[in-house]
Amino acid sequence: MNILEMQKVNEIVNTFTQVCQDCFLTGSYRFNRASKDSDIDIAFPIMAKAPLIEYLAKINVTELEHSHYNAGVKFHLATVDQTINAVFLHPLDFVCWYIAANMLNASNVPLNNMARHDFHALHQIMISLPKMMIRDCVTSTNYKEFMSDMKNGQKI
């Protein structure tokens, strides 16, 4: 596979935003670390899993398989010859991943030059910070309140 242009990646994410409303790009494409072997990682709240699976049954995807990573699914999008990794998260984790991704993007840390294990350690620390602050507050009905800059879809 080739590394996709960010415009194309965002078009793909926007397609899923129209289906499931709340999702955002995460992983190597989000953090400017994509290689020719990279999947497009998209995070969703767990409530979006059934609607997404239903949608995938209607479009041209191949190699649909369940992933043990956060109740996810992995599939190949034939139209762009790219594998998509859909990650489904509890609303609290969804909010924390979103906040952590924004924090990492806003930091001055050269993420694309970090070793994989160093990046993953930093990512886990960033996810833990908001989780410590809001862990007793986030539910499946109010999680959007904690993502005030996500207006009807994705913000990168």
What spans do the regions from the language model cover?
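Catalytic core of pol beta-like nucleotidyltransferases
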Residues: 1-37, 44-156
